[in-house]
Amino acid sequence: MISEIGKAAVAEMGILLARFREDHNKLWLIGTATCETYLRCQVYHSTMENDWDLQAVPIASRSPHPGIFPRLGNERILGSSMEPLNPLKSFTGSVPVLSSRGPGNLNPRLRKSCCPQCTEKFEQELAKLVSEFANQSSEDKSESPRPQLPQWLQNAKLNNDSKVTALSQSKDQALLQQKTQELQKKWNDTCLQLHPNFQQNIGPERTVSPALCMPGLYNPNLLLRQPLQPKLQPSKNLGVSLQLNTTQMASKPQEKAASPPGSPVRTDLVLGPKQTETTPEKTLEDQAKDFLSRISSVPQNKFLDKFASALDADTFKRLLKGLMEKAWWQQDAASSVASAVSRCRLGNGRQRGGAPKGDIWLLFSGPDRFAKRKMASVLAEQFCGNSPIMICLGSRRDDEESDLGFRGKTALDRIAEAVRRNPVSVIMLEDIDEANVLIRGSIKRAMDRGKLTDSHGREISLGNVIFILTGNWSTMSPESYRNEYLMEEKKLVSLASSNWQLRLSLGEKSAKRRASWLHDEDRPTRPRKELNLGLAFDLNEAADVEDYRTDGSHNSSDLTVDHEEEPGLENRRFAIASVPHDLVSSVDDTIPFKLIEFSFARREIKKTISKKFSMVVDDKVSIEVEDDIVDRILGGLWRGQTSLEQWVEKVLGPSFDQLQPRLSTLDENAVVRLQLELYTALKGQSNGECLPSKVTIVADGQVMSTTS
């Protein structure tokens, strides 16, 4: 709409100019516009300047002084009496040229801080620098031939040029001042390295502040020396840095030492209240102790080591607590992950090409992929404040969602894109044992070089990314046990994926058969076998018969408590030899994950629920949890992101509180049962969680309420 109006206005103005030109009349139009508006007009109306015979004149940002422009004259638009304030031809000034020695504008400490040789070389370079600035200024001010302009345009242009020239002159002066200070600092450092003896001789004199007698290039910083304060950084190099700082502080000459007898200066000029010194000079050890809060009983190096260890312990405890809350059935793996990450984050001497290494590579090997994901989520939440990035290098599983945004991209492209978007993140590369040779080779080179190359040949630095490689390298024997474990895993996943809700009901205690997983774990003492004393013993019987006992036990003793390991348990341990050697040698640490002890997990679930119930309700009333409910809760905890304690506190806790007043009137035979709610096909879990968020309370066959 605006473009059409502009085109119409331009066309009408062109017609008006053409009409006046036919009668040999003159039409003057004066208008103002911003630079952006004028450029936009040139883009949309390229022939506007020729059609209107426009002559663009820049206008200064600040209005001129009153009285400069007189009233309109008869001969010219602005009259002929106005003269340029600062004619361009009469402007011959440039950046003030400093003298070759420059004693007035130089830092007066230079002569004391540099030897005569370095001072002479500094003055030579300074003279050369000043001459270069003068030549550059004269070249910039040389005028190029311009077409003749009307007098009023020349006056406006000269006024604008004078202001631009003054601005450029001030910029040149500031730039020359900066270059001079940099040159002075350069020769101070050079003299300190080449002539250390001269610096030591003038050391006591350098602490005296010179009198600032004349303004110039010299602009000293604060005269007071800033107090040395340690910066607490979570790094194992903290102790070393503190020791270096205290050593440098103590190795400096005594600044407040008495002046020599022949010195005319006998006072120290400082800003602030003067501190009275009544104690003698302290030794290096005493100064270090004062710096570390007056520690007298513990040596300095031991305190620094203990301080760094305290930072390590704090990081380790916080991380271990988060890992144990989310994956409490993998206690050994959680402890190993916390130790490895804390050690890598604090340096641990990890270097790549002589520089500290920022990225971290961990290898999670073994089964239980859901526990690996939970630990990756804890790492991302505590160190990065976001969720981990999951990239599958193998075949996609049924329970995983496909990301349409990465369709058509290789795994390396997805990794590079994730690093490019967020260089401080946690990236989990799942199923690296199923990746092809090219992907594994590229990841191996990224570990060694610290840069990842995508499919287009572009390299990207890994930054401070925590990479987690996962693989199912483990040995499970016999094969029947492996199949049994996989079936149990699929069962839990299936139960957790279905829609289900919970119900709390009141009833009386009844004899109930113990769960099968309780019989397996809490077996009684093995009874003595009935031995047939009349049975002949054949010494020629084959000695390699493996199972010669009737009960199928590998224990040859008949009088033992049943604490022997279950068949195949010794083969469930992670075998490090099965992992490729190139991955083990390249990653920062390898963490083995064990098979899930389902019986242990079930016991922990019942124990946690019973503990919460006993805290709310009287001990005379007990709670019973059905076996099917325990399996469903285990599957939901395994797949979801909620921890067991959080779910019990948030969902079951309010239900127990609501049930507590009614239980106070019941006898000891009363029992509360946690059961599966029937007819819940239309009810689902909230927020995509695998655990129910509501509990229905039923008493005497009637629904009391539903809590959430």
From Swiss-Prot:
<dbReference type="GO" id="GO:0005524">
    <property type="term" value="F:ATP binding"/>
</dbReference>
<dbReference type="InterPro" id="IPR051650">
    <property type="entry name" value="SL_signaling_regulator"/>
</dbReference>
<protein>
    <recommendedName>
        <fullName>Protein SUPPRESSOR OF MAX2 1A</fullName>
    </recommendedName>
</protein>
<feature type="short sequence motif" description="EAR">
    <location>
        <begin position="537"/>
        <end position="541"/>
    </location>
</feature>
<comment type="function">
    <text>Probable component of a transcriptional corepressor complex that acts downstream of MAX2 to negatively regulate karrikins/strigolactone responses. Involved in the (-)-germacrene D signaling pathway influencing plant fitness and occurring in the stigma in a KAI2IA-dependent manner.</text>
</comment>
<dbReference type="InterPro" id="IPR003959">
    <property type="entry name" value="ATPase_AAA_core"/>
</dbReference>
<keyword id="KW-0677">Repeat</keyword>
<keyword id="KW-0378">Hydrolase</keyword>
<comment type="similarity">
    <text>Belongs to the ClpA/ClpB family.</text>
</comment>
<dbReference type="Pfam" id="PF23569">
    <property type="entry name" value="NBD_SMAX1"/>
</dbReference>
<feature type="region of interest" description="Disordered">
    <location>
        <begin position="248"/>
        <end position="283"/>
    </location>
</feature>
<keyword id="KW-0805">Transcription regulation</keyword>
<dbReference type="Pfam" id="PF07724">
    <property type="entry name" value="AAA_2"/>
</dbReference>
<dbReference type="InterPro" id="IPR027417">
    <property type="entry name" value="P-loop_NTPase"/>
</dbReference>
<dbReference type="GO" id="GO:0016887">
    <property type="term" value="F:ATP hydrolysis activity"/>
</dbReference>
<keyword id="KW-0804">Transcription</keyword>
